[in-house]
Amino acid sequence: AGAAELQPELAVAEHVRYESTGPALCTVVFLLVYFFGMASSIWWVILSLTWFLAAGMKWGNEAIAGYAQYFHLAAWLLPSVKSIAVLALSSVDGDPVAGICYVGNQSLENLRGFVLAPLVVYLFTGSLFLLAGFVSLFRIRSVIKQGGTKTDKLEKLMIRIGIFTVLYTVPATIVIACYIYEQHNREAWEQAQNCSCPGDPHRPKPDYAVFMLKYFM
């Protein structure tokens, strides 16, 4: 009976899990999704940093441009190192819902280490720079108003930056919340799936609306 119960799980694993030694197309899909996804998050942090340097620290364009090579190095090197680490650890697996190759779909440790933790760090760091920049702009706005000068242009800039912040931070926060929901409940889902008690109405099940929301974001 035990062997019969394991056969479906092994069959599912064969269809879901693809490691670095698997099809080359799976590896390419993983690199396209994971590498560029993480790179885009780092570029957002860099954009937030440069805006803080310009608005809060009064750096000029030339001073910021002098660090461009370091920004490019960070934006491309960090995702490269993480992608290589995933491939070296044979941690590429398949998403059973979306049907793409990614990391962390079969291992909570990989989900937390390679996906959830970096996204949280990037969102927190970028938001911190944006908040510091807004505080500096509000101070500048107060000083300008006290001098009797109009602040229309500055306020328009603040509105644009605010819209940009919302358009990124809200979807990023939703994606992180979906990953937290998944990593918090996945063990219970797997235990319920492996339990031979099909008539249990209270068996925990994943809410697929949460997964669809994550993919939409």
Swiss-Prot record:
Query: Keywords assigned by UniProt?
Result: Cell membrane, Developmental protein, G-protein coupled receptor, Glycoprotein, Membrane, Receptor, Transducer, Transmembrane, Transmembrane helix, Wnt signaling pathway
Give me the Extracellular side stretches, as residue ranges: 1-26, 91-113, 182-209
Per UniProt, subcellular location reads as: Membrane; Cell membrane
Q: Which residues cross the membrane?
A: 27-47, 70-90, 114-134, 161-181, 210-217
The UniProt entry, under InterPro entries, shows: Frizzled/SFRP (IPR015526), Frizzled/Smoothened_7TM (IPR000539), GPCR_2-like_7TM (IPR017981)
| UniProt xrefs under Pfam families | Frizzled (PF01534)
Instruction: Give the primary localization class.
Output: membrane
A GO biological-process term: system development
Where are the Cytoplasmic topological domains?
A: 48-69, 135-160
Q: Write out the GO MF terms.
A: G protein-coupled receptor activity
> What cellular-component terms does GO give this entry?
plasma membrane
What topology does the record note for this protein and the membrane?
Answer: Multi-pass membrane protein
Q: Which residues are glycosylated?
A: N105, N194
Tell me which positions the record assigns to the signal sequence: none
**Function noted in UniProt:** Receptor for Wnt proteins. Most of frizzled receptors are coupled to the beta-catenin canonical signaling pathway, which leads to the activation of disheveled proteins, inhibition of GSK-3 kinase, nuclear accumulation of beta-catenin and activation of Wnt target genes. A second signaling pathway involving PKC and calcium fluxes has been seen for some family members, but it is not yet clear if it represents a distinct pathway or if it can be integrated in the canonical pathway, as PKC seems to be required for Wnt-mediated inactivation of GSK-3 kinase.
Family, per the entry?
Belongs to the G-protein coupled receptor Fz/Smo family.
Any domain commentary? The FZ domain is involved in binding with Wnt ligands.
Would you tell me the protein name for this molecule? Frizzled-8
Q: Which gene encodes it?
A: FZD8
